[in-house]
């Protein structure tokens, strides 16, 4: 875990916003009403409070900014040098120093004007002193506009810096630009560093994390370094130099054997020699990358001699690798981690605290008193168990998955071959089938198939001889007539069913039966033709009952035979109900509004009086009409909720 968390630094507002925040806070958090009729001591206290409150807000906010930013003398030298490279140490200290000076100036302004407010003799004079005090504070902060802007940019950049723990196990990758450093860190960690085929793709430090031997390791990818004096290096290169100089880590120096990075092997070796002082007292590994393009054996003799010369130094291992084919990548990582672990242990052994740790562990070895060999006593059962376990370890059988991979499509899963408790000749016997507790095999005859063939042969002979042939039926005239009538009945039934289906499919409103009776499609002619088609003699049926008059309720017509004759209009005293064939009208009940009324004049007068009474009732009760039966809320909640106080009793 890192010791520094730069993301917690509070936002530094611009000068204008800084002043607005402070003055707005004063306006919101202090009293705002004062009158000239108040005692002068109260007026002085009112404006003194505003000046002191504003000064305290400025003081607290500036102190927060100064304390949040790291002090270069207190942080780790790595972060101190990195901030010097990125932000210019002098400029950084100057900005914080000027904010500290502004804080003291604001305090002095408040002190002076509070002293003057003690002698204010009117509301106007006290108000002007307060206005002057706040104005001078705002002027002081306006002059810090450039410092506040600079510190905000530093804060944003600090919050975007990777979290690097200077005391953790670290691997640093360095070398010329475009030699494969970012590709290597992407392979061994979960980092996602941009990789492009041009120089200086990586412009800042990138950190990835990996695991080795259940320990956490941080891998730092540095920008490319060019071979020129330290004074001429730019900010990008100086970040790598800072990491190499201050972090106690294992250094991986990458070289491009194919020279596709734009630098020859001689230049890469020269850079290695020039920055070698930075590798002092650090584990160092030379990683030769891109062997998938060119191997050391394919190099000319003079270039191969350069690699051979590097390999002569036994303290610096030279390892070959390729990030494209992932050849040697994990070997380089393992070697770097092992070297750093041994280096850290060696460093701890040199400290004074190591004696206290070593004294806790002590292995006592007895001194031999004679030459007699005293072997440890191991029980026979224990040794036999060890031998048995060794035999089991040697007797490793093939798994079904391995057999399947060898045989491919010819493989079939055989689960019975490992039934060691069953004899081999009985291992593949068919398992008997049981039905309702009975073994089916017990009811199967050995000659059942022969008997089945014999039965089939006998049945074939019977069919050929006509045993199963159905005799032809001789139908007389009566039976034929019955069948013909039955056929017609079935046809008629099908027609009626289809008509019903078609009528039900019509997308029309359904009329209730009591509103309009269903008029069936019947007529005298249709009846006569149907009966004649069935063989019935219909001659002499002109005066039959079915030919007499019937009332048509829909059209007010009388059907005489197949013709329709208009009905005579009924009198008022007669009923409008169905007129039977007898011609006797049915009397309807008299209307209720005419009961007990002698003549037409009295009837009209009664109608006018009823209409007036109904209108009066509707208006007075607020009804919508004569038939309005709406009942509203009888106890409105806003009038009947809560306790009944003394002053509310007149409302209920």
UniProtKB/Swiss-Prot annotation:
Question: GO:BP terms for this protein?
Answer: cell division; ribosomal large subunit biogenesis
**A GO-annotated cellular component:** nucleus
Query: For GTP, which residues are the binding ones?
Result: 175-182, 221-225, 289-292
Which coarse location class applies to the principal site listed for this UniProt protein? nucleus
* Location of the OBG-type G domain: 169-341
Tell me which InterPro entries the record gives: G_OBG (IPR031167), GTP-bd (IPR006073), NOG1 (IPR024926), NOG1_N (IPR041623), NOG1_Rossman_fold_dom (IPR010674), NOG_C (IPR012973), P-loop_NTPase (IPR027417), Small_GTP-bd (IPR005225)
Region (Disordered) location: 501-521
Keywords in alphabetical order, please. Cell cycle, Cell division, GTP-binding, Mitosis, Nucleotide-binding, Nucleus, Ribosome biogenesis
| PROSITE patterns registered for this protein in UniProt | G_OBG
Please give one Gene Ontology molecular function term for this protein: GTP binding
State its location(s).
Answer: Nucleus, Nucleolus
* Biological role stated in the UniProt entry: Involved in the biogenesis of the 60S ribosomal subunit. Required for normal assembly of the mitotic spindle. May be involved in both centrosome-dependent and centrosome-independent spindle assembly programs. Acts as a TP53 repressor, preventing TP53 stabilization and cell cycle arrest.
Q: NCBIfam families, from UniProt? A: small_GTP
Query: Which family does the similarity line name?
Result: Belongs to the TRAFAC class OBG-HflX-like GTPase superfamily. OBG GTPase family. NOG subfamily.
Q: What is this protein called?
A: Nucleolar GTP-binding protein 1
Q: Which organism is it from?
A: Drosophila melanogaster (Fruit fly)
Designated gene of the protein: Non1
């Amino acid at each position: 875990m890192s010791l520094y968390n730069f993301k917690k630094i509070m936002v530094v507002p611009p000068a204008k916003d800084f002043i607005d925040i402070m003055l707005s806070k004063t306006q919101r958090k202090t009293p705002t009403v004062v009158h000239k009729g108040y005692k002068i001591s109260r007026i002085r206290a009112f404006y003194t409070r505003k000046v002191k409150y504003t000064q305290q807000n400025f003081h607290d906010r500036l102190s927060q900014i100064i304390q949040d930013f790291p002090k270069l003398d207190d942080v780790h030298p790595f972060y101190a040098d990195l901030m010097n490279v990125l932000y210019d140490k002098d400029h950084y200290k100057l900005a914080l120093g000027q904010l500290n000076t502004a804080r003291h100036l604001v305090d002095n302004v408040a002190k002076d004007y509070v002293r003057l407010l003690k002698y204010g003799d009117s509301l106007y004079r006290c108000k002007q002193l307060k206005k002057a005090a706040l104005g001078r504070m705002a002027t002081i902060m306006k002059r810090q506009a450039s410092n506040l802007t600079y510190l905000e940019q530093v804060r944003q950049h600090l919050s975007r810096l990777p979290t690097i723990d200077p005391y953790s196990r670290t691997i640093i990758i360095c070398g010329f630009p475009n030699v494969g450093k970012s590709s290597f860190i992407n392979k061994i960690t979960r980092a996602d560093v941009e990789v492009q085929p041009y120089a200086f793709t990586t412009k800042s430090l990138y950190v990835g994390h990996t695991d080795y031997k259940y320990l956490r390791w941080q891998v730092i990818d540095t920008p490319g370094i060019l071979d020129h004096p330290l004074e001429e290096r730019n900010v990008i290169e100086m970040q790598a130099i800072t990491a190499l100089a201050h972090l106690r880590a294992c250094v991986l120096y990458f070289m491009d054997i194919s020279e596709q990075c734009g630098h020859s092997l001689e230049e890469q070796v020269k850079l290695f020699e020039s920055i070698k002082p930075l590798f002092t007292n650090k584990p160092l590994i030379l990683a030769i990358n891109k062997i998938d393009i060119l191997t050391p054996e394919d190099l000319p003799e003079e270039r191969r001699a350069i690699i051979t010369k590097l390999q002569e130094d036994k303290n610096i291992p030279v390892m070959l690798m390729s990030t494209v084919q992932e050849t040697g990548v994990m070997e380089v990582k393992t070697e770097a981690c092992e070297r750093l672990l041994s280096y850290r242990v060696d460093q701890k052994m040199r400290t004074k605290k190591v004696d206290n740790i070593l004294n806790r562990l002590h292995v006592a070895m007895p001194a031999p008193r004679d030459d007699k060999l005293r072997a440890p006593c191991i029980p026979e059962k224990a040794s036999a168990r060890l031998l048995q376990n060794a035999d089991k370890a040697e007797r490793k059988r093939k798994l079904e998955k391995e057999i399947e991979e060898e045989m491919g499509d010819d493989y079939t899963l055989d689960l019975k071959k490992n039934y060691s408790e069953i004899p081999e000749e009985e291992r593949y016997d068919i398992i008997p089938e049981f039905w309702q507790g009975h073994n089916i095999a017990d009811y199967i005859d050995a000659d059942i198939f022969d008997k089945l063939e014999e039965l089939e042969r006998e049945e074939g002979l019977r069919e050929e001889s006509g045993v199963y042939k159905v005799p032809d039926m001789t139908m007389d005239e009566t039976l034929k007539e019955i069948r013909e009538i039955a056929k017609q009945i079935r046809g008629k039934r099908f027609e009626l069913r289809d008509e019903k289906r078609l009528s039900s499919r019509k997308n029309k409103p359904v009329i209730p039966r009591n509103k309009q009776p269903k008029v069936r499609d019947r007529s005298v002619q249709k009846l006569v033709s149907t009966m004649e088609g069935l063989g019935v003699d219909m001659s002499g049926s002109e005066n039959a009952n079915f030919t007499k008059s019937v009332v048509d309720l829909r059209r007010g017509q009388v059907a005489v035979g197949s013709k329709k004759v208009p009905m005579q209009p009924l009198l008022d005293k007669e009923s409008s109900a169905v007129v039977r064939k007898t011609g006797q009208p049915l009397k309807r009940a008299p209307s209720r509004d005419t009961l007990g009324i002698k003549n037409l004049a009295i009837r009209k007068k009664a109608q006018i009086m009823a209409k007036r009474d109904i209108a009066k009732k509707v208006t007075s009760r607020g009804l919508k009409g004569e038939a309005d039966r709406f009942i509203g809320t009888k106890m409105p909640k806003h009038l009947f909720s809560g306790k009944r106080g003394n002053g509310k009793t007149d409302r209920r």
